[in-house]
C-alpha cells in the first residue's frame, strides 16, 4: 500500500492499493475489512476487501481463493463483479464492484413490506442471476437479504460467495452452512443435499419476506427455530395474491423432490406477471468453444490453479486426466470458461500507479505467460512506465526504475509468496503526490481518511495493520468460531439494528475504534443515511405551557410510545410496536423541539410557535404516521378530548404529586394537572412530573388495538408458531 502526502503541518496522507486510493470503511466481514477505493485517474469507485493472511487459518484462506475463482466464472448484470486481485506477503486485496444502494435488508426495514409488483421485480432479478449460477454448476448456499445489494437504480446484485460451492453433475453437497432462517430442512438435518434445491428454498423465504415484511420461520430460541424449519409449517397471510401463494408453497416445500425447480418457477403465472409489466429477463447465453488439449504444456497454469481452489477438483492428477480427455466433460467446460474470462479480461500490471516507496507494496495478481487460441505462448508484458520515487520523494530516472523493478519492486506474484519484509497496507512513508496527466497534482477530496504512522526510535515508520476479523489471537478460538459460523452463517444479521457509524469511525483506518462496524456485513454502509427528515407544525394563539401539555397528551395517548424530557422545549420519543417479531420491525426514534418564531425566547403568553419533529432513526413512513397523529391533536380547536374519547381512554393512573390517586379519574383532569405543572414551572415553582401511566389504553388514535402500529398493520406474535396464527384482520394493503 502506498502513502502519499505533504510535509509540514496539516499534512494529508492517502493510502493506495494499486491505483485505488483508500477512503472510508464500508464494513467488516468475516474474513476481512472492506474499504471504499477511488481510482486516482478515472475516479471510479470500488469496494476493496482486505484479508489478513497471517491471522486466518488455511481453510479460511482457501475459501477466499474459492470465492475469487467462482466470481471469475460468473459474469451477470445481477451478480457483484470482481475487478482485480492485489496481494503482498501479508495481505490479500479483492477489488470488487461498488454499489451505492445498500442492502436489500435495509431497504426492506426502511420501507416495510413491498407491493407484489416491486417484489416481483426483485424476485425476477434474483432468479435470473441464480439460474445463471446454476447453469455454471455454482450454488450460492447463503442467499438472504443481507447478501443482496442494490445499485443506484435499485437493481439487485448478489454478493458474498464465500459459502458458494461448485456442484458437478449429480453429486450432492454435505457442508451445513448458511443462516438457519433461510436454510432448507435437509441442510438443518445435516443430510447430503442438492445445492440447487437449497437455493430455491432460500429464494422462497426471501420472496415471503419481501411480500410480508416478516420471515415464515422465526423464533428467539435456536432449537425451536430449527424445529419449525424442519416441519416447514408457516402462516400464509391473506393479502398475498393466490397465484403467489401457490408459488411460495411450491418453493418452501419440505420434500426436496417435490420442490419447484428454477425452470418451473420461471414458467409460473405469478412470475410471468400481467400485461402491463415488463417481460421477465431472458437467460444470458454464454457459449464457449471446448476443444481438445493435446498435452500438459497446453494447459494454462493460472486456470489450473483457479480450478484447484474451487474445492471439488482437489485431486490434481484426476483433474489433469479429465482435461486431457477427448470427451467433453464438466471439467473441460469450467476450464474453458475460466480461460475465456482470462483472455477477454487479461490482468496486466497497472500503468496509472501513484508514486510508491515501500518494501512490500501490494502487487496486482497478473496473468502468467499464457497460451493464446493458436497454441503459442504470449510474450510476457513488461510495462515499467510508472513514476518511481526515492526515500526523499524525488523522481527516479527510468533506467534506475527498471533496476528497482528487477529487484522485486514489481514482481508478478501468482501464488502470493513474495519476497521482502511485511508492511502494513495502512501506513507507509510520505512521498510527493503523483502528478496527473495534465501536470497538476491530484486533488485530495474532502473527508479523505488521515493516518499518521508513529515513529519508532530508529526513525522508521511503525506500521499499524488492521486487526483480524477473527476474535482474539487464540488459534482454538478462531477454529471454534469458524466451525460455528460455517453452520449458523449470520443468524442475527436479520435482526440487527441499522447502525450508522460516526464520522470518527468512518475516517479511522483501523477497526479497533469501530466496534459497531463489526456487527454489519460487508456492504451494510453503502446506503447514505445522512439525510435528515423533519416535519414542521406551526401553532398560533396558544401559550407555551398549553402546547407542551398537548404534546405530552399526544405522547401518552399513543400505545407503545415512550418519551423523555430533554429541556424546557425539547422532547425525545420512541415508538416501538409490541407483540410482533423484531425481524423487520425497527423502532421509530424522533425528537420534538418547540421554538418561538418571532423572537429569541418565548416571553409572550400567546404567539406563533413552531414544533419541529426530527426523525433520528427508523422507518420514515411510520414516523410520518406517528407525527400525523400528534399533529391532529396539536391543531385541534378543542383543548379537551370529547366525552366519547374520554370514555374510551379512561385508565387507572397514579401521579407522584398525589393529585390523582384513585382509579377511574377522567383523563381530562389528568392533563389539566400537566398543564398546571408546566404553568408552575414557568412561574419558577418546583414542578413534580407525573409518573408514567401503569396501563395504556387498548384503543388509541392509531388503530383499534395496541398491536396496531402507525402503519395500521397488525404485528405478528413473537416466538409463537406462525401456523397457529389466524389471518390478520387489521392489516391493510400498502398504497
From Swiss-Prot:
This is Serine/threonine-protein kinase BRSK2. The keyword Nucleotide-binding applies. It comes from Mus musculus (Mouse). Transmembrane segments: none annotated. Serine/threonine-protein kinase that plays a key role in polarization of neurons and axonogenesis, cell cycle progress and insulin secretion. Phosphorylates CDK16, CDC25C, MAPT/TAU, PAK1 and WEE1. Following phosphorylation and activation by STK11/LKB1, acts as a key regulator of polarization of cortical neurons, probably by mediating phosphorylation of microtubule-associated proteins such as MAPT/TAU at 'Thr-504' and 'Ser-554'. Disruption phenotype: No visible phenotype. Mice are fertile and healthy. In contrast, mice lacking both Brsk1 and Brsk2 show little spontaneous movement and are only weakly responsive to tactile stimulation: they die within 2 hours of birth. Defects are due to impaired neuronal differentiation and polarity. Residues 298-340 form the UBA domain. Disulfide bonds: none annotated.
Amino acid at each position: 500500500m502506498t502513502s502519499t502526502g505533504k510535509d509540514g503541518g496539516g499534512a494529508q496522507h492517502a493510502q493506495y492499493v494499486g491505483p485505488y486510493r483508500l477512503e472510508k470503511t464500508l464494513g467488516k466481514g468475516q474474513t476481512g475489512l472492506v474499504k471504499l477505493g477511488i481510482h486516482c485517474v478515472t475516479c471510479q469507485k470500488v469496494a476493496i476487501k482486505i484479508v489478513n493472511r497471517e491471522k486466518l487459518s488455511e481453510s479460511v484462506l482457501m475459501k477466499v481463493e474459492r470465492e475469487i475463482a467462482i466470481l471469475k466464472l460468473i459474469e451477470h448484470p445481477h451478480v457483484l463483479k470482481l475487478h482485480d486481485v492485489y496481494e503482498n506477503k501479508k495481505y490479500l486485496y479483492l477489488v470488487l464492484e461498488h454499489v451505492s444502494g445498500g442492502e436489500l435488508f435495509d431497504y426492506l426495514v426502511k420501507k416495510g413490506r413491498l407491493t407484489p409488483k416491486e417484489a416481483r421485480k426483485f424476485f425476477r432479478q434474483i432468479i435470473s442471476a441464480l439460474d445463471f449460477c446454476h447453469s455454471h454448476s455454482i450454488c450460492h448456499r447463503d442467499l438472504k437479504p443481507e447478501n443482496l445489494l442494490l445499485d443506484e437504480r435499485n437493481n439487485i446484485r448478489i454478493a458474498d460467495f464465500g459459502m458458494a460451492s461448485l456442484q458437478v453433475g449429480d453429486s450432492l453437497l454435505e457442508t451445513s452452512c448458511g443462516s438457519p432462517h433461510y436454510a432448507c430442512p435437509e441442510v438443518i438435518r445435516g443430510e447430503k443435499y442438492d445445492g440447487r434445491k437449497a437455493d430455491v428454498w432460500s429464494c422462497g423465504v426471501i420472496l415471503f419476506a419481501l411480500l410480508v415484511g416478516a420471515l415464515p420461520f422465526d423464533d428467539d430460541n435456536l432449537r425451536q427455530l430449527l424445529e419449525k424449519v424442519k416441519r416447514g409449517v408457516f402462516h400464509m397471510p391473506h393479502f398475498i395474491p393466490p397465484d403467489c401463494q401457490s408459488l411460495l408453497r411450491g418453493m418452501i416445500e419440505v420434500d426436496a423432490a417435490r420442490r419447484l425447480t428454477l425452470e418451473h418457477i420461471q414458467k409460473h403465472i405469478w412470475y410471468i406477471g400481467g400485461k402491463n409489466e415488463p417481460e421477465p429477463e431472458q437467460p444470458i447465453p454464454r457459449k464457449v468453444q471446448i476443444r481438445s488439449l493435446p498435452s500438459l504444456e497446453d494447459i494454462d497454469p493460472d486456470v489450473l490453479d483457479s480450478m484447484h481452489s474451487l474445492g471439488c477438483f482437489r485431486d490434481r492428477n484426476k483433474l489433469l486426466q479429465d482435461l486431457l480427455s477427448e470427451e467433453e466433460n464438466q471439467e473441460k467446460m469450467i476450464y474453458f470458461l475460466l480461460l475465456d474470462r482470462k483472455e477477454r479480461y487479461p490482468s496486466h500490471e497497472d500503468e496509472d500507479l501513484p508514486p510508491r516507496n515501500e518494501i512490500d507494496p501490494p502487487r496486482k495478481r497478473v496473468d502468467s505467460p499464457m497460451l493464446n487460441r493458436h497454441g503459442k505462448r504470449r510474450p510476457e508484458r513488461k510495462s515499467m512506465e510508472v513514476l518511481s520515487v526515492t526515500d526523499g520523494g524525488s523522481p527516479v530516472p527510468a533506467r534506475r526504475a527498471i533496476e528497482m523493478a528487477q529487484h522485486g519492486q514489481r514482481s508478478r506474484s501468482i501464488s502470493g509468496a513474495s519476497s521482502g519484509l511485511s508492511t502494513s497496507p495502512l501506513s507507509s512513508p510520505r512521498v510527493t503526490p503523483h502528478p496527473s496527466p495534465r501536470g497538476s497534482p491530484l486533488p485530495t477530496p474532502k473527508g479523505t481518511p488521515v493516518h499518521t504512522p508513529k515513529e519508532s526510535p530508529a526513525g522508521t515508520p511503525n506500521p499499524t495493520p488492521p486487526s483480524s476479523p477473527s476474535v482474539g489471537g487464540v488459534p482454538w478460538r478462531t477454529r471454534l468460531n469458524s466451525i460455528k459460523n460455517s453452520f449458523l452463517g449470520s443468524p442475527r444479521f436479520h435482526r440487527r439494528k441499522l447502525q450508522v457509524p460516526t464520522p470518527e469511525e468512518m475516517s479511522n483506518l483501523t477497526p479497533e475504534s469501530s466496534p459497531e462496524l463489526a456487527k454489519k456485513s460487508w456492504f451494510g454502509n453503502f446506503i447514505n443515511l445522512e439525510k435528515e427528515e423533519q416535519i414542521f407544525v406551526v401553532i398560533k394563539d396558544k401559550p407555551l405551557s398549553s402546547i407542551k401539555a398537548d404534546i405530552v397528551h399526544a405522547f401518552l395517548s399513543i400505545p407503545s410510545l415512550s418519551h423523555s424530557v430533554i429541556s424546557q422545549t425539547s422532547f425525545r420519543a420512541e415508538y416501538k410496536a409490541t407483540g410482533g417479531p423484531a425481524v423487520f420491525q425497527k423502532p421509530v426514534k424522533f425528537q420534538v423541539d418547540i421554538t418561538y418564531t418571532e423572537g429569541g425566547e418565548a416571553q409572550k403568553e400567546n404567539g406563533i410557535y413552531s414544533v419541529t419533529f426530527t426523525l433520528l432513526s427508523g422507518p420514515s413512513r411510520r414516523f410520518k404516521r406517528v407525527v400525523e397523529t400528534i399533529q391532529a391533536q396539536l391543531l385541534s380547536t378543542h383543548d379537551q378530548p370529547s366525552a366519547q374519547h374520554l370514555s374510551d381512554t379512561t385508565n387507572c393512573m397514579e401521579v407522584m404529586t398525589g393529585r390523582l390517586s384513585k382509579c377511574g379519574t377522567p383523563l381530562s383532569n389528568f392533563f389539566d394537572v400537566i398543564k398546571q405543572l408546566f404553568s408552575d414551572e414557568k412561574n419558577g415553582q418546583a414542578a413534580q412530573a407525573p409518573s408514567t401511566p401503569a396501563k395504556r389504553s387498548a384503543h388509541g388514535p392509531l388503530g383499534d388495538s395496541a398491536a396496531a402500529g402507525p402503519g395500521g398493520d397488525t404485528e405478528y406474535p413473537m416466538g409463537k408458531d406462525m401456523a397457529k396464527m389466524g389471518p390478520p384482520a387489521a392489516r391493510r394493503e400498502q398504497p
